[in-house]
């Protein structure tokens, strides 16, 4: 609309200059015609000019309205439909994908279905194997399950002696206590201990004491039947444990750990 108005204004200015030159030349012609200036009316050129301007304005308005109707203004057709009717030459469409592929040979459809079905079956089989392999790798192996629990025969352990076995990579002390050892363990004032525990809490059978042979200070292995209290002594930093595995002296903060165990038979012990 603005472009049309600009073009029309430019044409009107040209026509106005032409009309002005025409009127001026006519005025000069009248003045040069030898007639008396008083006999010729002075308002004639201005009347011609005003009428000419009015005709130009009417023509301009009619042409603008006609142009507006041509580009879709004031028409009943939507702008989108009008744009489709008058496409722009700058819009370029890619027609390379408008070609239709030729239909395949009907006799080869069975082969294509067979190939697709076979590929899907192979893919499903490989996926199943991968899932099974992942599940099996997450489960514990037989060696790990065997190390998770340890069965110990207690028949060969003499009273007053300590046996060391390996369980989950750690030493485990199994001590068969005598009657004097049991009395000594129960005679201790629990309130004076650094890590107070009753002896009955640490054993299931008073005759057998089972503890993990790792010092609770820095992980050294204490020596059995040593120390000031007849239990275990850690040579690394001088921690002393009594006959129940409780810390009595030295830098160790806690008692020796008691693992999970149970008695299968009278002389069978299962650790873990």
Curated annotation (Swiss-Prot):
Protein name (record): Cytochrome b-c1 complex subunit Rieske-1, mitochondrial
Q: Residues in domain Rieske?
A: 201-270
The task this protein performs is described as:
Component of the ubiquinol-cytochrome c oxidoreductase, a multisubunit transmembrane complex that is part of the mitochondrial electron transport chain which drives oxidative phosphorylation.
Q: Where in the cell is it found?
A: Mitochondrion inner membrane
Q: Name one Pfam family in it.
A: Rieske
For region Disordered, the annotated ranges are 27-46
> Any further remarks?
The Rieske protein is a high potential 2Fe-2S protein.
Which residues does [2Fe-2S] cluster bind? 215, 217, 234, 237
Q: Where is the transit peptide?
A: 1-60
Membrane topology according to the record: Single-pass membrane protein
**What sections of the protein cross the membrane?**
110-132
Q: What GO molecular function annotations does the UniProt record carry, in alphabetical order?
A: 2 iron, 2 sulfur cluster binding; metal ion binding; ubiquinol-cytochrome-c reductase activity
Keyword list (alphabetical) reads: 2Fe-2S, Disulfide bond, Electron transport, Iron, Iron-sulfur, Membrane, Metal-binding, Mitochondrion, Mitochondrion inner membrane, Respiratory chain, Transit peptide, Translocase, Transmembrane, Transmembrane helix, Transport
- List the disulfide bonds in this chain: 220-236
For the Mitochondrial matrix compartment, the record's topological domain ranges are 61-109
Q: Supply the EC number(s).
A: 7.1.1.8
Which ranges of this chain reside in the Mitochondrial intermembrane compartment per its record? 133-272
Under PANTHER family, the record lists: CYTOCHROME B-C1 COMPLEX SUBUNIT RIESKE, MITOCHONDRIAL (PTHR10134)
Keyword Repeat belongs to the record = no
**Organism lineage:** Eukaryota, Viridiplantae, Streptophyta, Embryophyta, Tracheophyta
Q: Transmembrane: present as a keyword of the record?
A: yes
Q: What family is this?
A: Belongs to the Rieske iron-sulfur protein family.
């Amino acid at each position: 609309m603005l472009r049309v108005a600009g073009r029309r204004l430019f044409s009107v200015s040209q026509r106005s200059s032409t009309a002005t030159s025409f009127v001026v030349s006519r005025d000069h012609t009248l003045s040069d015609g030898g007639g008396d200036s008083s006999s010729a009316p002075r308002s004639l050129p201005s009347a011609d000019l005003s009428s000419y301007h009015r005709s130009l304005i009417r023509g301009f308005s009619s042409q603008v309205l006609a142009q507006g109707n041509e580009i879709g203004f004031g028409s009943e057709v939507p702008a989108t439909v009008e744009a489709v009717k008058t496409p722009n030459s700058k819009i370029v469409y890619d027609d390379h994908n408008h070609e239709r592929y030729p239909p395949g040979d009907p006799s080869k459809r069975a082969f294509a279905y067979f190939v697709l079905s076979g590929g899907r079956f192979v893919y499903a089989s490989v996926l199943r194997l991968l899932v099974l392999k992942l599940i099996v790798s997450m489960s514990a192996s037989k060696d790990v399950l065997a190390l998770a629990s340890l069965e110990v025969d207690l028949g060969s352990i003499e009273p007053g002696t300590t046996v060391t076995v390996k369980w989950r990579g750690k030493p485990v002390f199994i001590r068969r206590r005598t009657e004097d050892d049991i009395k000594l363990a129960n005679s201790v004032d629990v309130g004076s201990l650094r890590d107070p525990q009753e002896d009955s809490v640490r054993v299931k059978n008073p005759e057998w004491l089972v503890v993990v042979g790792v010092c609770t200070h820095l992980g050294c292995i204490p020596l059995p039947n040593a120390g000031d209290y007849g239990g275990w002594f850690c040579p690394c930093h001088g921690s002393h444990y009594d006959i129940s595995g409780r810390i009595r002296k030295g830098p160790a903060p806690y008692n020796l750990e008691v693992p999970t165990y149970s008695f299968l038979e009278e002389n069978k012990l299962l650790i873990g």
